[in-house]
Swiss-Prot record:
It comes from Rhizobium leguminosarum bv. trifolii (strain WSM2304). Catalyzes the ATP-dependent phosphorylation of N-acetyl-L-glutamate. This is Acetylglutamate kinase. Signal peptide: none annotated. One of its GO terms (biological process) is L-arginine biosynthetic process. It catalyses: N-acetyl-L-glutamate + ATP = N-acetyl-L-glutamyl 5-phosphate + ADP.
Length: 295
């Protein structure tokens, strides 16, 4: 006899119940980015996942990026992107567009998607409620010929120096789901564009989040045979960076995970945001679908 759809849903919910109980009243920060942001169907699936987390008693917080959309808007407005050491230089005109795209357009699109599920999302950035303060990022690059380090001036690219959790604690006690753009003020009065991964890590650390999820375009951390590594300690992650197993763009991602754990996050997961309902599959199944990094 074939299992009906309702019977299948009931069986899946029964399996998920222990995990729902485990995460009840816990904070889960989700960094939303990558391919999933540009796919309408994946966007709807993501919004429904966040809504179900809230309905299950979890306190979800969304932090989002938007690099491709920023680049597209700069091109549309005829502003040429400048790069130093492979990093985008953000001048005054550029940071104004960054804030417009991140805190305006993208943020409100995500808020609208979640609101369409029947839940209440609220769009924020680091400026709201003095939630986050930043300072000018200090980046260096080493000259391959002379081996001398050179300081890069990236303009209004910032690093988080302070997180005030007051507003987020208030929202956690409400029915609201915060959706946060990685833009923050400095004590100098300037506006700074902040890497969304490090911004999410700082938020999660300040809240001592149970989980921080990074939605990416890859399955997670892979071993030398290309197989997914399900769990890593911080020490094991350092060792895999040292021996070259973790390489390229995955290195800064894993280093951000490690920083978040040092800041107080209980566990950080790198997972594939291109998988529909990836958030639920990670949180409400026994083994998850990504790589969990723990202390």
């Amino acid at each position: 006899m074939n299992e009906s759809e309702s019977e299948l849903q009931a069986r899946l919910l029964a399996k998920a119940l222990p995990f729902m109980q485990r995460y009840e009243n816990k904070t889960i920060v989700v960094k939303y980015g990558g391919h999933a942001m540009g796919n309408p169907e994946l966007g709807k699936a993501f919004a429904s996942d966040i809504a179900l987390l809230k309905q299950s008693g979890v306190n979800p917080i969304v932090v989002h990026g938007g690099g491709p959309q920023i680049g597209a808007m700069l091109n549309k407005m005829g502003i040429e992107s400048k790069f130093e050491g492979g990093l985008r230089v953000t001048d005054q005109k550029t940071v104004e567009i960054v804030e417009m795209v991140l805190a305006g357009s993208i943020n409100k699109e995500i808020v609208a998607l979640i609101n369409q599920t029947g839940e209440w999302a609220i769009g924020l950035c680091g400026k709201d409620g003095n939630m986050v303060f930043a300072e000018k990022a200090r980046k260096t690059v080493k000259d391959p010929d002379s081996n001398i380090e050179r300081v890069l001036d990236l303009g209004f690219v910032g690093e988080v120096v302070e997180v005030d959790r007051t507003l987020l604690d208030l929202l956690a006690r409400s029915e609201m789901i915060p959706v946060i753009a990685p833009v923050a003020p400095g004590r100098d009065g300037a506006t700074y564009n902040i890497n969304a991964d490090t911004f999410a890590g700082a938020i999660a650390g300040a809240l001592n989040a149970t989980r921080l999820l990074f939605l990416t375009d890859v399955a997670g951390v892979l071993d030398k045979n290309g197989q997914l590594i399900k769990e890593l300690s911080v020490a094991e992650a350092h060792a895999l960076i040292a021996d070259g197993t973790i390489s390229g763009g995955m290195i800064p991602k894993v280093e951000t995970c490690i920083d978040a754990i040092k800041a107080g996050v209980q566990g950080v997961v790198i997972l594939n945001g291109k998988t529909a309902h990836s958030v639920l599959l990670e949180i409400f199944t026994e083994h998850g679908i990504g790589t969990l990094i723990v202390p």
